[in-house]
Swiss-Prot record:
Source domain of life: Bacteria
Protein name according to UniProt: Uncharacterized protein HI_0109
Keywords: Signal
Endpoints of the signal sequence: 1-38
Database matches in SUPFAM superfamilies: Bacterial polysaccharide co-polymerase-like
Length: 113
């Protein structure tokens, strides 16, 4: 049972890091964020320019998300919002995969009955 749990945890973490570091997902988040829209207007920046302040790195199996050119409160707000967004995307993806697997199992069961 421990191996199954470990595999599920690893799979979920892999999906999380994949979505977290996806430039398409970052752009989707930034485009829907009211905070980012307001900042873009005030700072006269495009969403693409704001996206350039997000840096992802991996060193020694350690993933890092770095936000630059924001004050501490903005970083806290953006970080929390982005992690929440990524978590929701991961949850949707994993739930959809699970539903697909269950449907496949039920179909196989119907065929053998």
């Amino acid at each position: 049972m421990v191996k199954i749990e470990r595999k599920a945890t690893d799979s979920a973490y892999h999906e999380f890091t994949k979505i977290l570091t996806s430039s398409a997902q970052l752009m989707a988040f930034l485009n829907q964020s009211d905070f980012v829209k307001a900042r873009a207007k005030v700072e006269n920046e495009t969403v693409q320019q704001i996206a350039s302040h997000f840096k992802f790195s991996q060193e020694n199996n350690l993933n890092q998300l770095i936000l630059s050119s924001f004050d501490r409160e903005e970083v806290d707000q953006l970080f929390v919002e982005y992690i929440r967004y990524v978590n929701n995307q991961v949850r949707q993806t994993l739930n959809n995969e699970l539903i697909t697997k269950w449907k496949s199992l039920f179909e196989k069961r119907k065929i053998t009955d």
